[in-house]
């Protein structure tokens, strides 16, 4: 199968530049605002969109993304509404890949077969489910592959040579390298070490390698872009949105403008870095 993710990374490889992968939480701070953010991301320079699935117990996420998940849940966001966001986005954009990211519990409650059917119909291209290891491929990974949806794995600095083949087995779309041990939003690791890790993983797979966790500024994104096929930015975008909300999580400023300003700066920095490196 060839998905929008495969097509996008092939296009970017031909252009000689990495992808900017942007994460935000579905329904944050409310459905209407979040959908406006989603539609604005590609125009600001996002190549791939990671659409967060709100969950009450996000064990891998730091305070910013935890709060970003609780705001939409408190406003009535459901997995069905997050899928609705993807479907509405697809009415205007049929090329930007959508990767839904989150935890297995909401999918399990929704029903795996029903979820995959609805995700495919909504234009979702890939899944990142952080609490499903490769030993549980039969739960969701293999059914997703059969449905034509990429299943994207996380690798970390502690993924050793014995574990790596298991992580890569049945992976598709791209590999998400977590730049450090810890939760989302923590400090970025040494970029030289990130480069070493990416080169090591590439010995075992032809899939693109995207690096995330801790990338907050255009300068950090540029540094990572010299080593990776893609740079993932999440917490910084979530914080940009949160900065336009009042203490109750309601819109007081312009979350869409704040998010797009940041993404535009990130995109310019990422693209310029690779162009400079290629000259």
Curated annotation (Swiss-Prot):
Alphabetized UniProt keyword annotations: Amino-acid biosynthesis, Aromatic amino acid biosynthesis, Lyase, Tryptophan biosynthesis
Keyword Lyase: yes
Enzyme nomenclature, EC number: 4.2.1.20
Pfam families assigned to the protein according to its UniProt record, in alphabetical order: Trp_syntA
SUPFAM superfamilies, sorted: Ribulose-phoshate binding barrel
Gene3D superfamilies cross-referenced by the UniProt entry: Aldolase class I
Coiled-coil segments on the chain, per record: none
Catalytic activity: (1S,2R)-1-C-(indol-3-yl)glycerol 3-phosphate + L-serine = D-glyceraldehyde 3-phosphate + L-tryptophan + H2O
InterPro entries, sorted: Aldolase_TIM (IPR013785), RibuloseP-bd_barrel (IPR011060), Trp_synthase_alpha_AS (IPR018204), Trp_synthase_suA (IPR002028)
Annotated active site: 50 (proton acceptor), 61 (proton acceptor)
Involved pathway(s): Amino-acid biosynthesis; L-tryptophan biosynthesis; L-tryptophan from chorismate: step 5/5
Any GO MF annotation of the entry: tryptophan synthase activity
Origin superkingdom: Bacteria
GO cellular component: cytosol
Function: The alpha subunit is responsible for the aldol cleavage of indoleglycerol phosphate to indole and glyceraldehyde 3-phosphate.
Quaternary state and interactors: Tetramer of two alpha and two beta chains.
Recorded family membership: Belongs to the TrpA family.
Name of this protein: Tryptophan synthase alpha chain
